[in-house]
Amino acid sequence: METSLWATTAFTVLMGLLSTLVALPLAMGLAWLLARRRFRAKPIVETVVMLPLVLPPVATGYLLLQMLGVSAPVGRLLDAVGLEVVFTWKAVVLAMIVMSLPLLVLTLRTGFEQIDHRYEQVAATLGASPWRVWLTVTLPLARRSVVVAALLGFARALGEFGATIVVAGSIPGQTQTLSVALFTFMESGRDAEARDVLWVSLALAALAVLTAQLLRRREARP
């Protein structure tokens, strides 16, 4: 059953927003850990976080598919609690999270590294707990980096294709995002529909990236 372009667009945007909302807190924690802490497993954590950036997206999707299969521990656990992920909207969100996480972490890590540690040290000296220092000093100073990271991560999520089509498939109205719809139309020779999807995808991506660049330029001003 076919769905309209606007329904597919709304679904893609919703999935992108959900994935960004879930990935952003995780990315903030990882970015802060990598920017501010020294620990033996740091190279391993960096490698695992960055893997989706260099692996073929289809390979990442296949890895997720294997992890979520009933023969894997994660898959067995999900099956035991009756939670179905593969070939559902949840798989779309999961693929978007995994593929956008490296970009989020890289952007946020740069933002945290640029913060003058002395502000945090002063707050700690005045009796603020580490959590309070994070909330009242670190996070406000990194707020623009957080917004930029969220926008770039959202744009990356909107354009995700390889991992999504492997782990979620292409079910119109259920798992079909703009990028998957574009591939489907191209594959079936429906050039007019493919062009419509392409222009909408370009507009959404350009808007998110342009907004992020404008915020970066504002942050760079003295």
Tell me the role of every PLM-derived stretch:
Residues 1-7, 167-206:
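Interhelical loop and adjacent transmembrane-helix boundary motif
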Residues 3, 61-97, 168-171:
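Membrane-interfacial helix termini and adjacent extracytoplasmic/periplasmic loops
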Residues 5, 108, 129-150, 154:
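Short hydrophobic alpha-helical segments within the ABC transporter permease transmembrane module
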Residues 5-34, 97:
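Transmembrane alpha-helix signature in integral membrane proteins
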Residues 69, 146-184:
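Non-cytoplasmic
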